[in-house]
Amino acid sequence: MPSSAPSQRQLRVGEQARHALSDVLQREDMRDPALEGAVISVSEVRMSPDLKIATVFVSPLSGDKEAIIAALNRHARYIRGRVSPALRQMKYMPEFRFHLDTSYENFEKIDRILRSPEVARDLGDADDEDDNG
């Protein structure tokens, strides 16, 4: 049964790809209206076990997020070509698949819930029990 945790090689290549993609997305001019002036943060790159597919999680900091993701996927082959010099040690250049990173929104939602008066009251009751017990 295969392990679900990524290997050291997957993690290392994913991090190298993340850095290379960040540079390309920051410096390249991809003549697409959805990407004009868009600031895009590459938060994570997950490599498949065979290193042929890279799932790229991005956070557009401005603009229409869905349109930006669609544009990145349309330009994936161009981006792949621009990233290839930075990953020249690889036997096969991975296929990039761009997805919206929602981890920050999830973090904000959980933080809001934890700060709500109901949860604060319940957490306060638990602290009182710990002090008495």
Swiss-Prot record:
Hydrolase recorded as keyword: no
Compartments (UniProt record): Cytoplasm
One Pfam family here: RBFA
Keywords: Cytoplasm, Ribosome biogenesis
Protein name: Ribosome-binding factor A
A cellular component annotation (GO) from this entry: cytosol
Family to which this protein belongs: Belongs to the RbfA family.
PROSITE patterns found in the cross-reference section: RBFA
Assembly and interaction partners: Monomer. Binds 30S ribosomal subunits, but not 50S ribosomal subunits or 70S ribosomes.
Its job: One of several proteins that assist in the late maturation steps of the functional core of the 30S ribosomal subunit. Associates with free 30S ribosomal subunits (but not with 30S subunits that are part of 70S ribosomes or polysomes). Required for efficient processing of 16S rRNA. May interact with the 5'-terminal helix region of 16S rRNA.
GO biological process, one term: maturation of SSU-rRNA
GO terms, molecular function: ribosomal small subunit binding
